[in-house]
Amino acid sequence: MTMFEEGSILHFNPFYFENGNTPKPKYFLVLKTLENNVVLASLPTSHDHIPSTIEKKHGCIDNCIINFNCYYFKERKNIAYNEKDCCDFSFPRDTYVYGYRISLFDKRKFDKQIASSETILTYKGKLYAE
């Protein structure tokens, strides 16, 4: 198992944003590992941007009429398993992955930050297949 395996939930403390925003602790969901150390991933957020007209249930929320999609993780619902620590993982708050916030990241940048102790990377678990 590698940290950047598809479906892995990681935690950076802190995460350094490409746009220069203040670094802060952040979860990181690996969606796909591509060639040349590129990772397709999302930075889940606790900010709820689901329109009030859409029912909020754990799972994929998609409304093509208004071009809205996200995955909603209900707080404290076990969503992943950490094989190393033999424990389940759940987000402590309602958490959202929005389609428009999926990005490409260069894994080599993370490797350098970890090697120089600029950040601590913690493996939280691998998503359950649902």
Where are the predicted features?
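Compact nucleic-acid interaction/catalytic patches
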Residues: 21-24, 30-77
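C-terminal terminal-subdomain/extension
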Residues: 63-130
